[in-house]
Amino acid sequence: GLYGAVFAQEAKKAGKTCLVIDKRGHIAGNIYTEEVEGIQVHRYGAHIFHTSSKAVWQYVNQFAEFNRYTNSPVANYHGEIYNLPFNMNTFNKMWGVVTPAEAKAKIEEQKREAGITDPKNLEEQAISLVGTDIYEKLIKGYTGKQWGRPCTELPAFIIKRLPVRFTYDNNYFNALYQ
């Protein structure tokens, strides 16, 4: 993958002999792309490079030309479009709230109504992070399908990496370079 490629490049630069072995029939791991009808297609799903380090950005640009891309996905729930990651645009569409304080109050209210004080599973953790409404519409079905089991059977830590922002920024990553 990317780590192995960087390691091999740096070792070679330092005068070492390198042999890159990959268990797949190609190098690059999960970031591997192949050309299909003139288009670079990610074989293993999109992987978006992002960093806030100017040094890292300059380093990787020695080897490839990058296209500027801002990942700002949306979710379609029965014809209703919601911004991801969950942010003030999502909260405004869901509840009509305008300020971060209003959104936080709504989430706290739904968390309290659900009786959650110490989240024990993914469902409880998700409700603690974004409220019952967003959990029911945008997390429950998708996550259950993704993992092949109900959210109540999944550990809470899985959802903790989910970005939740109390700004109107639809950018999935906070990184300067994408």
PLM region descriptions:
Residues 8, 57-58, 124:
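Short glycine-/small-residue-rich flexible loop motifs, especially phosphate/cofactor-binding loops
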Residues 4-5:
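N-terminal Rossmann-fold NAD(P) dinucleotide-binding loop
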